[in-house]
Amino acid sequence: MSGGACIAVRSLSRSWTDNAIRLIEADARRSADTHLLRYPLPAAWCTDVDVELYLKDETTHITGSLKHRLARSLFLYALCNGWINENTTVVEASSGSTAVSEAYFAALLGLPFIAVMPAATSASKIALIESQGGRCHFVQNSSQVYAEAERVAKETGGHYLDQFTNAERATDWRGNNNIAESIYVQMREEKHPTPEWIVVGAGTGGTSATIGRYIRYRRHATRLCVVDPENSAFFPAYSEGRYDIVMPTSSRIEGIGRPRVEPSFLPGVVDRMVAVPDAASIAAARHVSAVLGRRVGPSTGTNLWGAFGLLAEMVKQGRSGSVVTLLADSGDRYADTYFSDEWVSAQGLDPAGPAAALVEFERSCRWT
């Protein structure tokens, strides 16, 4: 007590936290920015209109996907909020690329990591998470992952990262080399440096929130298009203006689409949404893989289906410009699923029609 005032002190040594942040920052400095690839569009149908398509290649992150950025931001957010210390078990609700990337950062800091996921998660994805040092905890239904992740974190005295709530707030959307700033810096010397459109999918909603906010903050004329797969609540919520929608089943396109509208999804920064059939996402992923000479993941197929439609619209309207989308992860992770004819058929999907539409698009720039 001093001068009659009561004092309460909770301050602890920050040496471990300081070092943890240093390790994450050092890891980032050792990594180059991801490439911005120019997609080879046919010149034949662009005689009067000059359009260009770019892919931001997020597969070159050390953990192989766009989710590396999110995982890094979530860890820094939790560390700077005092939620993680040297004795914390880190928990997440994820069966996908987010869990792979978060397991990497947990291992970097010497912390245990538990990913809560549906029991139906593929063996290959479980193996990827475990290869980064993570442990998988299973629930029967995908709707149970949120509550179970909270329970596991409480039981272990750990911290639930909660990507679905914190994705939009953990990333500095004003800049600091976020994905939006990186795109615009890399586009500076291109013929059409300010994209007409940026196309992304929505899983947590964090990427679309970051890009949409940045566009407005920097006063760019770019518009943001969000593509959404079947069985996702985002598109019907956006089109109907209702955010209490819950879907009875989960998205079949890995990494995007959710059965509920996640807290990080900000519809107010989205200019357009496109509902993409799952068969079209698969057909586009296979088509683009053949063009690039390497496999891309299914959500990249969803992105490209949306981007191709916008390019066709621009050509039809006689409007020159550029479109940018994301190459979210590698298709090598999906050899037994989206690139397996047997698996696709077992899902009741037939990509033949969309595949033919893509061939016609490249021939004539007509879009159906």
UniProtKB/Swiss-Prot annotation:
Protein origin, superkingdom: Bacteria
Knocked-out gene: effects: Significantly reduced production of H(2)S in all media tested, cells grow significantly less well in the presence of 4 mM cysteine, no change in survival in mouse macrophages. 40% reduction in basal oxygen consumption (respiration rate), increased levels of amino acids, glycolytic and TCA cycle metabolites, decreased levels of the redox couple ergothioneine and mycothiol. Increased ATP levels in the presence of 100 uM exogenous Cys. Increased cell survival after clofazimine or rifampicin treatment.
UniProt-annotated binding residues for pyridoxal 5'-phosphate: G203, T204, G205, G206, T207, S299
One Pfam family matching this protein: PALP
Localization terms from the record: Cytoplasm
Keywords: Cytoplasm, Lyase, Pyridoxal phosphate
Cofactor: pyridoxal 5'-phosphate
Coiled-coil segments on the chain, per record: none
Any one Gene Ontology molecular-function term assigned to this protein's record: pyridoxal phosphate binding
Modes of activity regulation: Probably inhibited by aminooxyacetic acid (AOAA) but not by DL-propargylglycine (PAG); the former inhibits pyridoxal 5'-phosphate-dependent enzymes, the latter only inhibits cystathionine gamma-lyase.
GO terms of biological process kind: cell redox homeostasis; cysteine biosynthetic process; hydrogen sulfide biosynthetic process; L-cysteine catabolic process to pyruvate; positive regulation of cellular respiration; regulation of sulfur metabolic process
GO cellular component assignments: cytoplasm; cytosol; plasma membrane
The protein's Enzyme Commission number: 4.4.1.1
Reaction catalyzed: L-cysteine + H2O = hydrogen sulfide + pyruvate + NH4(+) + H(+)
Modified sites of kind N6-(pyridoxal phosphate)lysine: K67
Main location group: cytoplasm
Keyword field contains Protein biosynthesis: no
Annotated InterPro entries: Cds1 (IPR047586), Cys_Synth/Cystath_Beta-Synth (IPR050214), TrpB-like_PALP (IPR001926), TrpB-like_PALP_sf (IPR036052)
Top-level enzyme category: lyase
TM region positions: none
SUPFAM superfamilies: Tryptophan synthase beta subunit-like PLP-dependent enzymes
Role, per record: A cysteine desulfhydrase that generates hydrogen sulfide, H(2)S. The H(2)S produced by this enzyme stimulates respiration in M.tuberculosis, mediated primarily via cytochrome bd with a lesser contribution from cytochrome bc1/aa3. H(2)S modulates the balance between respiration and glycolysis, and also contributes to redox homeostasis. Probably eliminates toxic levels of Cys (which can induce oxidative stress).
Note: There is a large variation in the ability of different strains to produce H(2)S; H37Rv, CDC 1551 and 2 clinical strains were the highest producers of H(2)S.
Family under the similarity heading: Belongs to the cysteine synthase/cystathionine beta-synthase family. Cds1 subfamily.
Record-given protein name: L-cysteine desulfhydrase Cds1
Organism: Mycobacterium tuberculosis (strain ATCC 25618 / H37Rv)
Upper classification of the organism: Bacteria, Bacillati, Actinomycetota, Actinomycetes, Mycobacteriales
